Amino acid sequence: MIILNTQGIVLKAIRYKESDIILTLFTRKLGKVSAIAKGAKKNKSSLLSSSQLFSYSNFTLKKQGNMYKVTQSEIIKSFYNISYDIEAFSYATYITKLVENSILENQTNNRLFILLAQTLYLYTQDNTDNRFITAAFELKFLDYIGFKPIVNKCINCECKILQNSVFNIYEGGILCSKCSKLFDNNIKLDLTTISLMEYVLRNDILTCSKAKVSKYITHELEDILDKYLKVYVDNINFKSLHVLQSVKNNKGVDNDE
């Protein structure tokens, strides 16, 4: 019988039978696992709060067949107020779906775990620019799953003169003005956007959250990452992307610097 303690974040919570919940957890020690929280739907259950979507908790898990059973849990951060803000909820749902659909069972990724926990925390803060933070999450997520775009030098000749450079999704990064003539499907990006991408990749997301980014640059970053994700992430959830895009459209975008 395997029993272990690990920190975990609830990526999905599905009601099972009358009072149980089947959880998809992203954990530090086990990666993504399925676990059943018996009786968690009961009002007096000690597992109720830690079985809610986005909850970040210490879990005691016991191996049972193909899944685990939650025998004990203690909340670290509930992130409960995300559910009361439609915008924050939409962004949080999107990034948890992105993680859930992009990592394998029992595959650990502690950098991604910390990134997810910190991003959920930022969604609970009143002064967070959710659009920029979500784009920053996407960029760092791509790095942590092995698809980091190269933005600090030309991917072809490694020259670091990026004036008049372009971005090529299929080549995986920046092409200098000379090398851009050798490739198709280039996308022109503002040099500020390229510099911002380098900044995000170099710093943790809590540091990135302090940056003041214009709506125009945020929109350009969102657009290029949307295209990049669709090429490199096989199981991207298009339904959650559609919901997220509706939220963005309702917010509107202007070209103010």
Swiss-Prot record:
The species this protein was found in: Clostridioides difficile (strain 630) (Peptoclostridium difficile)
Swiss-Prot/TrEMBL GO biological process terms: DNA recombination; double-strand break repair
Keyword Glycoprotein: no
Alphabetized UniProt keyword annotations: DNA damage, DNA recombination, DNA repair
Domain of life, source organism: Bacteria
Protein name: DNA repair protein RecO
Gene: recO
Protein family per UniProt: Belongs to the RecO family.
InterPro entries to which the protein is assigned, alphabetical: ARFGAP/RecO, DNA_rep/recomb_RecO_N, NA-bd_OB-fold, RecO, RecO_C
